[in-house]
């Protein structure tokens, strides 16, 4: 849970648990830093905006048959992960308000269990996001370098099985987190997964873009060749690069918090960094808000479907948006 809630727990007489992902912001009386207070309304607003945006993304993918392709199925999986972290922080903020204002009374054990559930949702979300981004990267790789065999390799059934495997794995991770929340090994495993994902993605991208230059030139030299699909694959890879960049920027402070929490919890500088945990949660929620904007900016088909849903389904009146394409 976020650090402000954790401090309220301390006021209620609860102690921090060593394995709690977000409750371990160390307070040091001699630390020159103070917790950064962020209004509850900010968490609620970001959570609600992200929730609505990602519902719109999922609705667009379901509605438009042109988006019924593996890449957008994986994008839908990423949208569900973003929606999950938004729901977690949204309901957590509401719970904070109800508990601290005495509108809700819960036993200590129930509060601690609820804390674990919220943290588990964040754990599931980050693992699902990493796996979905990796799946999109593999899909773009196959699109660019195995273009003629793409339809046979990335079938709808196979992509569905991959998504099912991703969420089964993520749910298992969340369950393990609840069961072993007091163990620092859970946090270490989560950090290791994040760093491994970054290494895999960096290696894949380096290989992808180095070969893409040679591949594009070779295919463009063929007589009568149309490079539309090739450009589409490269465009999808660039979209993925944007998604990955935003993911790293928004989640890196959270994982650095976890690393410092394990390695130097009593150090004043580490304690100072960890005292701003609420800001790192805001960044995580911003990631969920920004992702749908990237989909809309990069995909004309997605943007068109957004217009149809918002203008015709929502208001039942046609409206016009400026097009950049």
From Swiss-Prot:
A lipid is attached at residue 311 (S-palmitoyl cysteine). The keyword Cell membrane applies. Gene3D superfamilies: Rhodopsin 7-helix transmembrane proteins. It comes from the Eukaryota. It is found in: Cell membrane. It is a multi-pass membrane protein. Pfam families: 7tm_1. This is Melanocortin receptor 5. The chain crosses the membrane at residues 38-61, 74-97, 115-138, 156-179, 187-211, 240-265, 274-297. Belongs to the G-protein coupled receptor 1 family. One of its GO terms (cellular component) is plasma membrane. Residues 1-37, 98-114, 180-186, 266-273 are extracellular. Receptor for MSH (alpha, beta and gamma) and ACTH. The activity of this receptor is mediated by G proteins which activate adenylate cyclase. This receptor is a possible mediator of the immunomodulation properties of melanocortins. SMART domains: 7TM_GPCR_Srsx (SM01381). GO terms for molecular function: melanocortin receptor activity.
